[in-house]
Regions:
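Short, low-complexity N-terminal intrinsically disordered segments enriched in polar/charged residues
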Residues: 1-22, 26
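Eukaryotic intrinsically disordered and solvent-exposed regulatory patches
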Residues: 5, 18, 28-29, 72-75, ...
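A short hydrophobic beta-strand element
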Residues: 80-92
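Intrinsically disordered, low-complexity regions enriched in proline, serine, glycine
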Residues: 33-34, 44-45, 53, 67-71, ...
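Short beta-strand edge/turn micro-motifs at domain boundaries
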Residues: 87, 95-134
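Eukaryotic basic, amphipathic alpha-helical target segments in cytosolic regions
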Residues: 21-28, 40, 44, 63-67, ...
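Hydrophobic pocket/interface hotspot
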Residues: 20, 31-32, 55, 108
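A solvent-exposed, acidic/Ser-Thr-rich amphipathic alpha-helical stretch
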Residues: 29-30, 38-82
């Protein structure tokens, strides 16, 4: 199979997205930590978390009881070093809050026959537009 075979990297990326958000929404988020490489980095709303332990603390320490992600779309592409870049767009609803738009980007790399996440960037789609002085 050719690395740039569209079906291959699309399937890997789509399977990752489906599994990640299913785990995040429906089960113990501690299971997500197994997807991250030892030295992985997560940036959550501008705050950096380095390493699996720090990422586990962030993912399991969220203040909500329930959450549901609705994936609007995603883009998946291979990189020159045979990794996979995944960009996800959607909405999330936590507890009784109104739905919010979100964007999340994952870098997936092959390691010992499995795919691991080395980089994860999450941002809510909230715009902080300054009000002009009158």
């Amino acid at each position: 199979m050719q690395w740039c075979d569209n079906d291959y990297f699309q399937k890997v990326g789509e399977d990752f997205v489906q599994w990640y958000y299913n785990q995040f929404d429906n089960t113990n988020r501690m299971e997500l930590v197994n997807l991250y490489a030892e030295g992985a980095t997560l940036t959550w709303e501008g705050t950096l978390f380095s390493g699996r332990e720090a990422i586990a603390g962030k993912l399991t320490g969220m203040p909500f009881q329930q959450i549901k992600h609705i994936i609007t779309d995603h883009d998946i592409q291979p990189t020159l070093d045979k990794s996979i870049l995944v960009m996800v767009f959607g909405q999330l609803k936590a507890d009784n809050d109104l739905p919010l738009a979100f964007h999340q980007v994952f870098m997936l790399k092959p390691l010992n026959g499995n795919w691991v996440c080395t980089n994860d960037v999450f941002r809510l789609g909230v715009h902080n537009i300054p009000v002009e002085a009158q």
